Amino acid sequence: MRYWRIKAWKNNPFDAQREVLQELVTSAQYTEIGRKYKFSNLFNVRDFKAAVPVHEYEDIKPYIERIMKGEQDILWNTPIYWFAKSSGTTSDKSKFIPISNESLEDCHYKASKDVLTMYYQYKPDSELLTGKGLVIGGSHSINPVNNEAHYGDLSAVLFQNSPFWAHWLRTPELSIALMDEWESKIEKIAEATIKEDVTSVSGVPTWTLVLFKRILEITGKKNISEVWPTLELYLHGGVSFTPYREQFQKLIGKDINYLEMYNASEGFFAAQEQPGDDGLLLFTDHGIFYEFMPVSEYGKNDPQTIGLQEVEMGKNYAPVISTNGGLWRYLLRDTILSAAVTSTICCWAGSLAGPDALANALLMQARANCQRVGELLRESFESHSEALNVYKWTWW
């Protein structure tokens, strides 16, 4: 049943997006921001865009600070007790992104379940759930904001709120997963997991490689498949996997599946539908309404955006999102999306505020005829590949 629901929004992304926006606006119409922008009078996308300006973090920071002090019904209609602490690449100041119960259940967790469902559709004989998933999470433990609210990095918030049964399928234990000091953390993870039946690993490639090498040092094994013979899947994101793939294949010692995901504090946006796909499938029914702002519009007083159905191949965009966590027309300025050929979009982590952002965007546009982003990286960005975060997204 779950896969049929996935097919429904995958095959009808525009309808899914219209329904998401309607649900968001209806839910928040009696909040402070809903009353300010008269959400109850907004009946279509055009009205919504005309009424609500594009926001950046500094624009909504006063609202978030009030929520962190205990006020509610400000940005979203249900209580906000969790905040994901993140640092954007354009600022050394931390951001605190509100995490509602809806954004946990209907975005982050729902998307994770959909990734698992799509993988089982691809590999029906998978034994993924017969063992444990090794999760190399973030490094910020849960911290109190007040008597009711807490903050931590996204992985800490997700770990803390996950259902009890999820802990049975995950390793290492929470106290190790959320350690702050990475050298000690890697050592503890290695010691705790070498005797586990690990069937999947998820984490950023850099720290995963460090962990793999340490495990081989401890065990004296030739490769990771000798330590975890049932390992079949690696889930990754955060940076381009291209420069790391060969190292992973060598260290693991056998063929496994690789899945790329794109999630952040603001939401779970996309993932490969199955290993080997050229693009990431945009999640259009997960509490996020997407708009796309041409790079040339950045910095204007009234920047123009377009909808999903208006995205043009070969052009560059920055995503503007409205979410069930209370973000309204929020600009993800740390990420630039670039439309490519054959209904895919590649996304690389640049900075709209950076001095070379427009030049880089134009260069990416000039290379848009390349069919694979991996080829583009190898040919044009080989010396900088680790600094880029490149994705291709499939719309339909």
Predicted features along the sequence, with ranges:
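Active-site glycine/GP-rich loop and adjacent strand/helix microenvironment
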Residues: 1-40, 47-52, 63-70, 158-396
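Active-site diphosphate/adenylate-binding microenvironment
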Residues: 15-83, 95-99, 106, 114-125, ...
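Conserved helicase ATPase motor motifs in RecA-like P-loop NTPase domains
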Residues: 83-90
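Active-site-proximal glycine-rich helix-loop-beta segment
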Residues: 90-93, 334
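Short small-residue beta-strand/loop micro-motif enriched in glycine and branched aliphatics
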Residues: 92-97, 355-358
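Short secondary-structure capping/junction motifs at helix and strand boundaries
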Residues: 94-97, 117-132, 199, 256-259
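Conserved AMP-binding loop of ANL adenylate-forming enzymes
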Residues: 117-164
